[in-house]
Amino acid sequence: MATLRADEISNIIRERIEQYTREVKVVNTGTVLQVGDGIARIHGLDEVMAGELVEFEEGTIGIALNLESNNVGVVLMGDGLTIQEGSSVKATGRIAQIPVSEAYLGRVVNALAKPIDGRGEIAASEFRLIESPAPGIISRRSVYEPLQTGLIAIDSMIPVGRGQRELIIGDRQTGKTAVATDTILNQKGQNVICVYVAIGQKASSVAQVVTNFQERGAMEYTIVVAETADSPATLQYLAPYTGAALAEYFMYRERHTSIIYDDLSKQAQAYRQMSLLLRRPPGREAYPGDVFYLHSRLLERAAKSSSRLGEGSMTALPIVETQSGDVSAYIPTNVISITDGQIFLSADLFNAGIRPAINVGISVSRVGSAAQIKAMKQVAGKSKLELAQFAELEAFAQFASDLDKATQNQLARGKRLRELLKQSQSEPLAVDEQVVTIYTGTNGYLDTLEIGQVKEFLVKLRTYLKKNKPQFQEIISSTKTFTEEAEALLKEAIQEQLELFLLQEQT
């Protein structure tokens, strides 16, 4: 039988006492009172902060949004199906943040910046808060560089600048997403990082957009943040802020970024759902009172950084869906008042075959010609006014039987101008090609052609110019000005191509 040696036992006890470190850990905890519909009510959590992350016993994360006298309203970042009444919840002391890095380029992630494209984890050593304060007045400078969309109607008449917020608004199925995705495709080789945020869309639609980007090599400089229609309302509400945090990471590294929110109507609906379930008082159209702040704090993060901060930029292109063209509804008017202009897409124009279906009359860019190169200003200066006058005249001409020659000529010119603004989807044009197209139309070179021949002629003219007069493109690219030499080259090319085209049409 082994003997117990008292000195050994006392040595072991002494060692243990010497190694013992007293650690007091205070955890702010609470108990689940009620859970359901993506909302949990918690008793306790006395020192929780508004917007703080809380962790449930089974691992689900939530955000404390409602701090009431006897309970805390938490929105869940997941389905919460395994959370039970009476289970414990602890406050984490953190607010929502995501990892950020260059490795996110070319990836599809969710609102928590977790990859959902099946290509493994994304390496990141840095974190950014999902909700960051917008840059102040001193940190910004006015918008002066163009962000080319590749769409003639926009770049010539409703120009978008780097750091601007330009709303794309219209009914469903009018080509809003097409305008946004074409803008991303046109950034190839322009050193612009693009972020596409899909909120509450069908998974098939998001897959189609991603496939389009991959086929055209746009995923190299694009990040897609997607929360589809079956995602919890909390994640649909967070997705735009996640996209903004990713874009800001590049903006503060002196890079140019462009972010598309597709669409903010769905984010507002998700926020309305959360607010009503949290029993916040409803306002107009049952939206909560702070729905304006929901969008303003998001869109104010888009900026053109000052030269002290490296002149990076974040251009926001939010999309809002209207019902039967009603731009005076609550969410459309809110977002119109926050942004620096809007591109209005009309269902009537879309159905009439005018695509992109941009209503030039009520679309506007509050940055204006500051966001255009000099060459574009020179050729496109009057085109918006001419088109608006034509639309008015066309409406009047429906009731007039006999029109004078000048009016007939103006109508004929207007129809050809409208024709040259038509573009197929995913076929953006370079600036020099746009200058060629607009100059040809506004100077009457298309007046001798039938309307049906306009598109074909312009395609041939652009090809002819590229092949036979490459110096035209060089002048526009290097000087950004429509010089006399460039004009002479273009006039010569138009005359040569027009003669050739008419000859081919006769044979």
From Swiss-Prot:
Name of the protein described by the UniProt record:
ATP synthase subunit alpha, chloroplastic
Among NCBIfam families, the record links this protein to: atpA, PRK13343.1
Q: Where is the signal peptide?
A: none
| Record flagged with keyword Membrane | yes
Give the organism, scientific name. Acorus calamus var. americanus (American sweet flag)
Question: Which top EC class is given?
Answer: translocase
Query: Which gene name does the record give?
Result: atpA
User: Site (Required for activity): which residue positions?
Assistant: 363
Give the main location. plastid
- Protein task: Produces ATP from ADP in the presence of a proton gradient across the membrane. The alpha chain is a regulatory subunit.
MF annotations from Gene Ontology = ADP binding; ATP binding; proton-transporting ATP synthase activity, rotational mechanism
Q: Which UniProt keywords apply?
A: ATP synthesis, ATP-binding, CF(1), Chloroplast, Hydrogen ion transport, Ion transport, Membrane, Nucleotide-binding, Plastid, Thylakoid, Translocase, Transport
Family according to the record: Belongs to the ATPase alpha/beta chains family.
